[in-house]
Amino acid sequence: MKTYLVGGAIRDRLLGFQPKERDWVVVGSSPQEMKSRGFRQVGKDFPVFIHPQTGEEYALARTERKSGHGYSGFEFDTDSNVTLEQDLERRDLTINAIAEDEHGTLIDPFDGQKDIENKKLRHVSDAFSEDPLRVLRLARFKVRFDDFEIVPETLDKVTEIIESSELDHLTGERVWLEMYKSDNPWLFRKELTHMGADDVLYIDSKKSDGICLSPNMSNKLHMISCFIHEEVSNIDEFCLKLKIPNEYKDLANLLNQSKASIEEYEPVTDSYQQLIDIVKKLDIRKKDRLKNFFEVYTNDGNKGKVDFFQSFIEKLDQFRLEDEDRKKPNDEIKKVIEHSHRILAQDHIREYLDNQ
């Protein structure tokens, strides 16, 4: 039994980046032996084991054979006789097919180091075209390593995948995961478009309002919600197809619904009802969503407008009915609240204008 560090950790280190995680491949072992050493088995498709101390993933060396459609249409062989080179041969790109033994010696049968030096994204073998997920991974790596070039032979393999209709067998969840992993969803879509594979994102048409220009690119929720808001016409349908979490969908919908009206709003003496209507649509009860909404908006350079709305919302939050009003019928209570909100809005606008 021998273990090797493989894949992204080595690639990133050779590129001068700090590896985010480490993955290992185990040669000459079996599920029984791994479990006897305290490893915990996970994964349904093939044996992956979690190290009892580090929590890092260890996968048995394997080969694979195409047996169906999509990224899951493979049969795996994890026999103890599978070699390291055979395992590396099934990987997607040469830069991801480098291993390191316990002595720090690199095993690089497909010249991944040379492609890193020459800034090339190149498939390892003809098996690349059997897995449609690799098109999305290729786009993601091109976004991350923007100064790398996809070699023509690999683009030919992408064309083979597209023409085979294998992309149609990718699940929405897998498409979402690759988009989530990408450093920039706009560039991710752009790379897929260059490859002729952007249909896999299920984006029906591009909107052109250009409202959300400067999301915080270090905040996935802000960045992806802005992308959905900016690029997708039917947000609910798109998020349903890709199984996108509700917090992304909800923030994108709120951006769609309220960002333009806030941007267009100008505080003047008789605009108090417009102010109230805008704030109602924000649904200030959903505090986390509201916080993210204003963070996105502030990042677009609108701090003054954000301060104006947030301070008004704080006043609404602090408003309390008098004890005598609480005893009134519901329809009367509603009228009291609406009247009080109008007074608060008028006073807030007046205070703002006095300070200008």
Q: Where in this protein do the model-derived segments appear?
A:
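Catalytic cores of the polymerase beta-like nucleotidyltransferase superfamily
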Residues: 1-356
